[in-house]
Amino acid sequence: MSFVVIIPARYASTRLPGKPLVDINGKPMIVHVLERARESGAERIIVATDHDDVARAVEAAGGEVCMTRADHQSGTERLAEVVEKCAFSDDTVIVNVQGDEPMIPATIIRQVADNLAQRQVGMATLAVPIHNAEEAFNPNAVKVVLDAEGYALYFSRATIPWDRDRFAEGLETVGDNFLRHLGIYGYRAGFIRRYVNWQASPLEHIEMLEQLRVLWYGEKIHVAVAQEVPGTGVDTPEDLERVRAEMR
C-alpha cells in the first residue's frame, strides 16, 4: 500500500526558536524525523517549511522540500498547500508526521496509513493508554473517547471520561478506557481539500484542537491504539535536553 508522508516544519516557535534546526547529537532535529519517515516505507516524503535554512538542511540530507507560506494557522493548512502544489489525486493517502517528533517509531507511521487505507473514512489517527491520574489530569495530554467501532466521539484537554467513583477516592491510577491522543494523522488528499474550506468550529477554538473541526462537521476519525509508544516530542528546551539524552 503506497502512501506519502508530509512533515510540516515551521521555523518560528515561541518556546524554542528555530526548532526544526536544533541539534540532536550532531544532526538537525528535522533530519532525524526525515530518517524515521524513510524507515516507514513511504513512497514519497516531503518536508513542508516556510524557512530557507530548514529547506537547506533537508536537501543536504537528500530530502524533498516544498516551500509554503508562513501565515498558516495549523499544520493541516500547510499540508493543504502541499497537496495543491503537488497535485495529489483525491485518493492519495497522506500521513502528517510532526516535525518535532525525532523519536517517532516508523511502525506507527505505517500503521496509521494502513488503518486509513482499510476504511472508508477521511481521517485516521492513533492513541495510547493512560495509566496514571497525573497524565489523565494534564491539559497538555489530549484525551480521546471512542465508540464501539473505534471512531472518535470527542477529543479534549479535560479529563474524559470522568470516572466518578474512582476519582472521588483520590486514586493515583486510572481505569480502562483512558486514551491519550498522538499527534499523527492519516488523511486522503481529497479530505484535506474539504477540511480547509470549513470554517473553524467553536469547540476547536475553546480546546485549541484542530481535529475537533472534523467532528463538528459530522465526519468520522478512526482511532487505533498505537503498536509502539513514541518517545518524547520536543516542545521546550527541557524536552530537547531529555531527547538528546535518550537518543545518545
Swiss-Prot record:
GO terms for molecular function: 3-deoxy-manno-octulosonate cytidylyltransferase activity. Coiled coil: none annotated. Its EC number is 2.7.7.38. Signal peptide: none annotated. The gene is kdsB. Belongs to the KdsB family. Its main location: cytoplasm. It comes from Shigella flexneri. Activates KDO (a required 8-carbon sugar) for incorporation into bacterial lipopolysaccharide in Gram-negative bacteria. Disulfide bonds: none annotated. The lineage of its organism: Bacteria, Pseudomonadati, Pseudomonadota, Gammaproteobacteria, Enterobacterales. GO terms for biological process: CMP-keto-3-deoxy-D-manno-octulosonic acid biosynthetic process; lipopolysaccharide biosynthetic process. GO terms for cellular component: cytosol. It is an enzyme of class 2 (transferase). InterPro entries: Cytidylyl_trans (IPR003329), KdsB (IPR004528), Nucleotide-diphossugar_trans (IPR029044). SUPFAM superfamilies: Nucleotide-diphospho-sugar transferases (SSF53448). It is found in: Cytoplasm. HAMAP family: KdsB. Keywords: Cytoplasm, Lipopolysaccharide biosynthesis, Nucleotidyltransferase, Transferase. Pathway: Nucleotide-sugar biosynthesis; CMP-3-deoxy-D-manno-octulosonate biosynthesis; CMP-3-deoxy-D-manno-octulosonate from 3-deoxy-D-manno-octulosonate and CTP: step 1/1; Bacterial outer membrane biogenesis; lipopolysaccharide biosynthesis. Gene3D superfamilies: Spore Coat Polysaccharide Biosynthesis Protein SpsA, Chain A. This is 3-deoxy-manno-octulosonate cytidylyltransferase. It catalyses: 3-deoxy-alpha-D-manno-oct-2-ulosonate + CTP = CMP-3-deoxy-beta-D-manno-octulosonate + diphosphate.
